[in-house]
Every structure is written in structure tokens, then in C-alpha cells.
């Protein structure tokens, strides 16, 4: 299926030093600009955040301080990113809540005014959440391969919830432990 575009749609993703918008920094940006004629233009850049990347964050995205030590700072490439995104609508995964606000804040931090008015935003995660149930019945089907009958009956719901937890413990033994203190902190 082809997308119907009246102007470019920029799919983009950021890797950062953390989740704090206005406090953390971008270490990688990737953009796929889809033009109305179907042409695809790629932009990718690793960036020196000029602050340390916490080890726990490096373990998530695989980018270390050493890998970006000689890369340009965001300030040095903000202008080219601004021009690449000019006249684009945006798309991403959880982009409306993280990537777009983070990028706009970084642009403002380095003195680049980036206008969002008139742009359209496509968040693939929002589409996923609206079209794929994220309720007890869906979790029961996913983890237990059973259909939940009598949903919203308290007895059926607690039984299903218990079975889901047991299935999660079986499915994710490397990441979760059958210990209430651990599960509480998870």
C-alpha cells in the first residue's frame, strides 16, 4: 500500500542520553524522508551530546561516550537538520510524546525556532494502541492462548490475571523473577 502524501513525511527516531526533555541530549538521529513521488531520502547522524552518556543508557542503545567523542555536537548540525525537516509532516513510534518534543526542545536550546503549526503528526504507536486491544482479554489471549469468558466478572478477571502472571514468569525468566519484591520494583 502506498501513502498518499501532499508534502514530505519524515519518519524519525532519536537516541538520547536519557528521557528528560530539556536536560538530556541527542546522541543519534535517523530520518527517513518520504517524498510525495515515493522517493526516499535518508539522514543519519551520531552526535556528541557534550554530557556523559550514562552506562545504563548505553546498554539500551549501544552508543558509548567513546563512539561519539569525535562526532559533531547538536549545535553544529542543527541547521542541516532544520533544513532537512523543512516543510515536512512527522511520523514515528511514540514520537508525539518523546521524539518530537525532544527535538524541538534541542533546537530551541541552540537558538533554532522550529514551527510545528500546520504540520501533521503520525504516531504509529497511537495507531497500534487504538487498533490492537490492550486490555485483560487481549493479554489473556496473548499469554495464555485462551479466550477470556465472563470478562468483567471479578472471579474470571482475577483468575485470568493470575494465569497471565504465571505465563509471564514462564515467558520471561531472564528478565523477571518469581519474587513479589522484584515484581513490585519492576
Regions found by a protein language model. Name each.
Residues 12, 122, 156:
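Active-site flanking residues adjacent to catalytic metal/cofactor-binding acidic residues
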Residues 108, 132, 144, 163-173:
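Hydrophobic/aromatic-lined pockets within catalytic cores
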